[in-house]
Structures are given as structure tokens and as C-alpha cells.
Amino acid sequence: MENKYKLWVARDKNGFLFAYEDKPKRCDNKKEWFAEKFLFSIENSFFPNLKWEDEPLEVMLTQVIKS
């Protein structure tokens, strides 16, 4: 059985990586991304090619339940 969840990943100006439920919008003044729902922070070494200057990345998180 698999469950899939769509989320958005974005890196802030300081290099920190975050996941959002909706596509976030860039806030240049604060050098961060903002969305209705912030989900969680992500290990900074993940998505090494994703930079502050890039648009958020849409990803699918798949939960795999082993029997």
C-alpha cells in the first residue's frame, strides 16, 4: 500500500531547506519563502542543486508500508 503526498521544497537565502503544503512565495525583504502551511525543515544536504534563486520544487513524498 502506498500513500503519496505532494509538497513544495524551497531553500532560503541562508541555505536552509523547508517543505510547504502549498507553493510558497519568495519574500526578498526577509530572504525567506512563505506559504499558508509550513510543514517541516529538511536536511540541508538534500536537493543540493536547489538554490535561493530557483523557484520552489514540487515533489512527491511516498510512504511505503511493508507487510
Locations of regions flagged by a protein language model:
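Low-complexity intrinsically disordered segments
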Residues: 28-67
